[in-house]
């Protein structure tokens, strides 16, 4: 991988990680179109450290309050004594499913499921589910039924959104796409679903990145150029990722996810067309 390729893929990671269009799919599609090698699951996981940093910086005040509240609650023997402490435990609970399924299907995630057939199916499939979810949400709003805020997320919501996050292990699904969809199905507002989605990503993204760093440490240390490429891609992903978070949070306050639904379907169909014509290999 050249430095230019690493920079482009880092920018792509930052642009697509937080939008419900799947960063993994784009990191697989763009190299295929450009004639580059597949960067691999390890590259994807490690570069997510950049977008992880973006979440930490953007939500730094929320995260500090949550950590302080959790520690304070444990010291007082009242772990759920404040909304911030409760949110900390909801994030922990929502992380359990992806840890279980991630370890169980690790080999398939890194090999079979990276096929462009799987990716296109996931892009189109989740788009249809998200569309049905938006229809349901609009009907609920039309009936003036209330939507839940972040503070109303309980054990049920946390675990079910965590299960939705596990679906994102299939490349093309989109972590933010599955978790926001899960949140909307559980009657969260779009903004609340997005904010919880981003906070929920912290433990699993950090764990996946650290695991891949550990497993690839020898090859990284043996190749300074590869290490440099990863560093450049990670920094680019972080800078662009921060802007993507700010955009999506603001966008969802006033708009639906329709534009992302259309985009997913167009890209999914385009991939199948390119494979059929032999322009790219699955």
From Swiss-Prot:
Its EC number is 3.6.1.27. Keywords: Antibiotic resistance, Cell inner membrane, Cell membrane, Cell shape, Cell wall biogenesis/degradation, Hydrolase, Membrane, Peptidoglycan synthesis, Transmembrane, Transmembrane helix. The keyword Membrane applies. It is a multi-pass membrane protein. GO terms for biological process: cell wall organization; peptidoglycan biosynthetic process; regulation of cell shape; response to antibiotic. Belongs to the UppP family. It is an enzyme of class 3 (hydrolase). This is Undecaprenyl-diphosphatase. The chain crosses the membrane at residues 39-59, 85-105, 115-135, 153-173, 196-216, 230-250, 260-280. GO terms for molecular function: undecaprenyl-diphosphatase activity. The lineage of its organism: Bacteria, Pseudomonadati, Chlorobiota, Chlorobiia, Chlorobiales. Bacitracin is thought to be involved in the inhibition of peptidoglycan synthesis by sequestering undecaprenyl diphosphate, thereby reducing the pool of lipid carrier available. One of its GO terms (cellular component) is plasma membrane. Catalyzes the dephosphorylation of undecaprenyl diphosphate (UPP). Confers resistance to bacitracin. Disulfide bonds: none annotated. It comes from the Bacteria. It is found in: Cell inner membrane.
